[in-house]
Design a protein with these regions (language model features):
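Conserved alpha/beta-domain cores
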Residues: 120-121, 542, 552-883
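N-terminal beta-alpha lobe that positions the nucleotide/phosphoryl donor
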Residues: 13-265, 410-454, 500-507, 511, ...
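Conformationally flexible catalytic loops at phosphate/diphosphate-handling active centers
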Residues: 436-513
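Phosphate-interacting basic helix/loop segments used at nucleotide- and nucleic-acid interfaces
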Residues: 93-111, 218-228, 245, 325-348, ...
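Conserved phosphate/anionic-ligand binding catalytic regions in large, soluble enzymes, centered on
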Residues: 45-74, 116-144, 164-167, 172, ...
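ATP-dependent carboxylate/acyl-activation modules
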Residues: 29-32, 40-41, 162-166, 229, ...
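Terminal amphipathic helices with adjacent charged low-complexity linkers/tails
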Residues: 70-78, 178-205, 299, 345-416, ...
Length: 883
């Protein structure tokens, strides 16, 4: 059933017969158009998320305005043909439009009582605010008069027309939106009013005429008056919006395929701006910031839906609707209960009340913070709605990084400049910037920034991604800034009405304080605070909800999860986050302390082996102490210690910093200099050339393991390319273990796989290894011939922008590296079935890479401590997906 609003008021229409008629008269071409009553939520790939859920809501009897959906297939065909409609699409749109007009008793463009429609995008994967929408389509100078007569409200008709001209000219004709906003500002100033809603019918009619003139001047042609021409242009514009820079940027950040395309939804307009008995709003079935089971959202009286999400006006909390619209609020509560019960998940719903009649315009799974995500699924399990395994699969593993966000130190003193809406939790410190381009540039350069705007728009997405947080003067909890920030885990404070932004001067003032671009500020998105200067932050505390969900994940996963940690403090943090051991402990970091570096340099500068051994004897106690601390922190879990890897010159000062008279040091620095040190004298090559270095490290490990009861040390040799290298290093390691009386400790000896030759010939190396660990950072560099620093600094961003690469290979495992890993697993286990295999690059915390590691049968992944929860959840999801 669908709800049609025609001359006889709201009525219900059955479409089954009509749909059959339409289908029978269509030519034998692809079905590019579906009525809302002709689809279901299972057709997301065809109808897009919005269209599929409109169809689903129609089927369960919710009051959804009538309409139809142009499919994603039509979009893909249109884009592939360079902007030409595929065969049959025009006829199908015409027939479905005729059916809509007949059911609603109104005609598009009718001069007496016109049918108006909205044209909205709908990707198969939610992309809030990234693509285009046009409202009130079908208006022209004649039909706007008919709308005024049929509605009995001249102001409403004039407002609808100026909105349509503004949207259509911007979205379809490409006229810059600022030109219209400037005209509105001039009109308000001339009439001495502050808000758009204070402009009367005459002012709005004048604005519509001015908008038409702006469009004519900017495009060099008349604004289209024919409703079908308007509709065709709008459909094409929505198709084209799939490839706008902001949409592509969002997809790249969220890992969404560029090949999906967007559907287009054409829906009968219902109006929240007909007067004080009309309203529009956005509401969530649960709080998307905390997960609390309470209606969360906002509404505006006498407004259209875009006013809420665009943040142009700061709306009212949804609870106030109970007093203003008691009947509408009851219908809203019923609809929200129905929707959450049907979808078994938190829903994000758009609604409109038109002269007392309640309509649902959209539902989708609500974007939520990680904190809310774990609470919602835990509550749904407690309520008996979903099972534990489904709860684990529901949480976005990559999103768990958000739970690692710091908070403001409770003991800190600071000056609160202003308060706003706590739109997205977490605290952020950075320098104020006032446009998205600056935020992107400074953020990419490694500078923490806070993006400050009147309100954000979808075009700001590239700046939001690079900023530490977002601060806006306008907009509410469901505005674009709030929704996008929550989805990305960025702290956000919205609706700070006391904020006075001077974009030209690049500064803002609030309550007597002026903050200029580059000044440090802090925001607390959990409490809605804007703070002067940089405040100290403290690490996050894990919640009971988080602990419950990750415990369920541990029950489901096969893959072990370890952490990369070089200090006892890192090791303790890793244990707190659930790490089952240390997969990579880098020993070189231990040589840089104030007491240690001079001794390390003394060892490097020694003239002979005797001198080196004397210096190493002084370094040994430092190493042993560090290893004891890490082994104690891991409480019997395995600790894989990598022997010295970087070239020795890294421990010496730069040549230009050395006193010219110090010839000995200058000579040694010059002798160690290499053209390509990454492929030079490093890793196990150091152990072969200077075995005394590795002997000292192995002694320190064995002595530490003997001192810490129940410890499980493992020794890993880096950069092995040849079996003969590992054989010699194993002989050295076993000899020292025996000399130190560590034979009964069961210390495992293994190697990193970070050179393609080692991966290709792993069957030759495996006999000498108890375990192999893929060093995927270096393996990616050696496989792709990419220097990470040079690639990320010079060309990688352009490769991603131009789709030469779809993903950053240093974040997600490249297919070539995956092929080498698969080859290694097969060949190593072919000669040594029980060999332990894992990875220890940062890829170990990337959900997509974790899924691959699970699929090829690795035993564990290892990542930074703060990514351990993500890896635990991703490992469980990978296992559950294959059950």
């Amino acid at each position: 059933m669908v709800f049609c609003k025609g001359r006889g008021g709201l009525h219900v229409s059955s479409l089954q017969f009509e749909i059959g008629e339409i289908r029978s008269t269509l030519p034998a071409v692809a079905a590019y158009v579906y009525a809302f009553a002709d689809g279901s939520s299972g057709m997301r790939d065809v109808l897009g998320g919005k269209g599929a859920e409109l169809a689903e809501m129609t089927s369960i009897g919710l009051p959804v305005p009538d309409g139809f959906t142009v499919t994603t297939e039509a979009c893909r065909a249109y884009l592939a043909a360079g902007g030409t409609w595929p065969e049959g699409l025009n006829d199908q749109v015409s027939q479905h439009l005729s059916g809509l007009e007949e059911r609603c008793g109104r005609r598009l463009g009718d001069p007496d009582d016109p049918l108006l429609v909205s044209v909205r995008s709908g990707s198969p994967v939610s992309m809030p605010g990234m693509m285009d929408t046009i409202l009130n389509l079908g208006l022209n100078p004649r039909s706007v008069e008919g709308l005024a007569r049929s509605s009995g409200n001249e102001r409403f008709a004039a407002d609808s027309y100026r909105r349509f001209v503004q949207m259509y000219a911007n979205v379809v004709l490409g006229v810059h939106g600022d030109l219209f906003e400037e005209a509105i500002a001039r009109s308000k100033q001339a009439r001495g009013v502050k808000a758009d809603v204070e402009l009367d019918a005459a002012a709005l009619r004048e604005l519509a005429e001015e908008f038409l003139a702006i469009s004519r001047a900017e495009t060099g042609r008349e604004f289209p008056e024919d409703p079908r021409e308007q509709l065709d242009g709008a459909i094409q514009a929505v198709f084209a919006s799939w490839n706008t820079p902001r949409a592509r940027t969002y997809r790249r950040h969220e890992g969404i395929s560029d090949d999906l395309g967007t559907a287009v939804n054409i829906m009968q307009m219902v109006f929240g701006n007909l007067g004080d008995d009309s309203a529009t709003g956005v509401v969530f079935t649960r709080d998307p910031s905390t997960g609390e089971r309470v209606l969360y959202g906002e509404f505006l009286v006498n407004a259209q839906g875009e006013d809420v999400v665009a943040g142009i006006r700061t709306p009212h909390p949804i609870a106030e609707m109970q007093q203003d619209f008691p009947d509408g609020y009851r219908e809203l509560e019923q609809a929200m209960t129905t929707l959450e019960s049907h979808y078994r998940d938190l829903q994000d719903v758009e609604f409109t009340i038109e002269r007392g009649d309640f309509y649902v315009l959209q539902t989708r799974a609500g974007k939520r913070t990680a904190q809310a995500a774990v609470r919602v699924v835990r509550d749904l399990v407690s309520e008996g709605v979903i099972a534990q395994d489904e709860a684990v699969q529901r949480v976005n593993a990559a999103q768990l990084d958000q739970l690692m966000h710091p908070a403001i130190d409770p003991g800190a003193e600071y000056e609160v400049l202003a308060t706003g809406l706590n739109a997205s939790p977490g605290a952020a410190v950075g320098r104020a910037v006032f446009d998205a381009d600056t935020a992107e540039a400074r953020g990419r350069a490694g500078e923490p920034v806070i993006l400050v705007r009147w309100e954000t728009t979808p075009d700001d997405i590239h700046g939001v991604i690079q900023a530490q947080g977002v601060l806006t003067a306008h907009g509410g909890m469901t505005s674009h800034a709030a929704v996008v920030a929550r989805g990305m885990g960025k702290p956000c404070v919205c609706g700070v009405e006391s904020l006075r932004i001077d974009a030209g001067a690049r500064r803002f003032s609030v309550n007597g304080t002026t903050i200029s671009e580059g000044d440090e500020i802090s925001i607390d998105g959990s409490r809605g605070l804007v703070i002067s200067g940089a405040v100290p932050l403290v690490p996050p505390q894990m919640t009971d909800d988080f602990a419950a969900v990750t415990a369920w994940a541990d029950e489901a996963r096969r893959l072990g999860v370890r952490a990369n940690a070089d200090t006892p403090e890192d090791a303790r943090r890793a244990r707190e986050f659930g790490a089952q051991g240390i997969g990579l402990c880098r020993t070189e970091h231990m040589f840089f302390g104030d007491e240690r570096l001079p001794v390390m340099r003394e060892m490097i500068l020694a003239r002979d082996e005797e001198g080196r051994r004397a210096a190493l004897d002084r370094l040994l106690p430092f190493q042993q102490s560090d290893f004891e601390g890490i082994l104690e922190a891991m409480e019997g879990e395995p600790v894989t210690i990598r022997l010295l890897d970087p070239p020795l010159h890294e421990f010496l000062p730069d040549l230009e910093d050395v006193d010219p008279s110090d010839e000995r040091l200058r000579s040694r620095i010059k002798s160690l200099r290499e053209v390509n040190p990454m492929l030079g004298t490093r890793g196990c090559r150091l152990g072969i050339l200077h075995p005394e270095i590795y002997e000292m490290q192995v002694r320190a490990i064995v002595r530490a393991a003997l001192a810490v009861e129940g410890s499980r040390a493992e020794i890993m040799h880096p950069l092995v390319a040849f079996a003969t290298e590992l054989r010699r290093m194993r002989d050295l390691t076993e000899r020292v273990i025996e000399e130190e009386g560590g034979g009964k400790l069961g210390i495992l000896i293994g190697t990193m796989i970070e050179v393609p030759r080692a991966a290709l010939l792993a069957d030759r190396i495996a006999p000498y290894a108890d375990f192999m660990s893929f060093g995927t950072n270096d393996l990616t560099q050696t496989t792709l011939a990419f220097s990470r620093d040079d690639a990320e600094g010079k060309f990688l961003a352009q490769y991603l922008e131009d789709d030469v690469l779809s993903r950053n290979p240093f974040e997600t495992l490249d297919d070539g590296v995956r092929a080498l890993i698969e080859r290694t697993v097969e060949s190593a286990r072919g000669v040594k079935p029980g060999i332990k295999l894992g990875i220890c690059g940062e890829h170990g915390g990337d959900p997509d890479s974790v899924e691959f590691c699970n699929s090829v049968g690795l035993d564990y992944v290892s990542c930074s401590p703060f990514r351990v929860p993500t890896a635990r959840l991703a490992a469980a999801q990978a296992e559950l997906a294959h059950r």
